[in-house]
Regions:
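Conserved ABC transporter NBD signature motif
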Residues: 61-69, 78
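Conserved ABC ATPase signature
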Residues: 136-140, 144
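Helix-to-loop junction immediately C-terminal to a conserved catalytic motif
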Residues: 53
Length: 248
C-alpha cells in the first residue's frame, strides 16, 4: 500500500491572541498528486501550510508526512521532506551566488564535496537555471529568481513541494516556463494560490479552505465551475473565463 505524502487529521489551531484559525481540518494528499489550496484571505491557508513543516505546532490534531509525524523530535527530517517556496523569492535567496543559495540547504544538512555539487547541478538543471550558477541572484529577473528559489527546495529532494502564489508577478512567458517545470517534477505539489486559471492548468484536484475548515475537495474543473460554491467562498474567476472550456 502506498503511503500518502501528507495526512492531516483533525487539525485545529488558535493563535496566542485567541484567534481560532483552523477548526478540525482533515486532508490527505497522495504521493505524486498536484493539489491547489484555494480560499479567500483569512481562510487559514497560511496557518495550515506552517503546520506542514513544524513552524507552527501545539494545536489539536496531527500531521504526518510520508508516515512521519510532524513533531519536535522529527523536525530536521520533516523540514527536508516539506519544501516551501515563498511568494517573494528574495525572502529565500541570500547568498552571493545562485550556486551557493542552492547548496545552502544540503550543506547545512552535512553534505559535502562531489555529492553536494551533483545535488546542486541536478536541482538547477531541473529548473533550467544551470547556466546561471555563478551569477548573483539579484542580477536575475524576478521569474529567474523564482526558479532558483524552487531549485533551493528541490536540492533537498523533498517529499512535498509547497508553493505560495507561484504565478504572482510573473510575465506570461515566465508563467508558462514555471508551469512546464512544475509539470515535469516527480514530487507531490501543494499550491496555495488565488490564480484560479493557473490552479486549473496545473492541479487536477483542488481544496477550498474557508473560515478554517475544508469547504470543498474535488476535481479543480468541477469546483471552479460551481458558481454558487465560488460565490459562497469569495472566489472569482477572471472576467470571461470559463473553466469548462479548458481542455485538460
Amino acid at each position: 500500500m502506498t503511503t500518502a505524502s501528507l495526512e492531516v487529521s483533525g487539525l485545529a489551531y488558535a493563535y496566542p491572541d485567541g484567534h481560532q484559525a483552523l477548526f478540525g481540518v482533515d486532508l490527505t494528499v497522495d504521493r505524486g498528486e498536484r493539489v491547489a489550496l484555494l480560499g479567500p484571505n483569512g481562510a487559514g491557508k497560511t496557518t495550515l501550510v506552517l503546520h506542514l513543516n513544524g513552524i507552527l505546532t501545539g494545536g489539536v490534531g496531527s500531521v504526518t508526512v510520508a508516515g512521519l509525524p510532524v513533531a519536535r523530535a522529527n523536525l530536521a527530517e520533516i523540514r527536508r521532506r516539506v519544501g516551501i517556496v515563498f511568494q517573494d523569492p528574495d525572502d529565500q535567496l541570500f547568498m552571493p551566488t545562485v550556486r551557493e543559495d542552492v547548496a545552502f540547504g544540503p550543506a547545512a544538512a552535512g553534505m559535502r564535496g562531489p555529492e553536494l555539487e551533483a545535488r546542486v547541478v541536478s536541482a538547477l538543471n531541473r529548473v533550467g537555471m544551470a547556466e546561471f550558477a555563478d551569477r548573483p541572484p539579484h542580477h536575475l529577473s524576478f521569474g529567474q529568481r523564482r526558479r532558483v528559489a524552487v531549485a533551493t527546495v528541490l536540492a533537498m529532494e523533498p517529499e512535498i513541494l509547497v508553493l505560495d502564489e507561484p504565478s504572482s508577478n510573473l510575465d506570461p512567458a515566465s508563467r508558462r516556463e514555471l508551469a512546464d517545470i512544475l509539470r515535469s517534477l516527480d514530487v507531490t505539489v501543494l499550491m496555495v494560490t488565488h490564480d484560479l486559471p493557473y490552479a486549473l492548468e496545473l492541479c487536477p484536484r483542488a481544496v477550498i479552505l474557508s473560515e478554517g475548515v475544508i469547504a470543498a475537495d474535488g476535481p479543480t474543473q468541477e469546483l471552479l465551475s460551481d458558481e454558487e460554491l465560488m460565490r459562497a467562498h469569495r472566489l472569482e474567476l477572471p472576467f470571461g473565463f470559463n473553466p469548462q472550456s479548458v481542455s485538460l
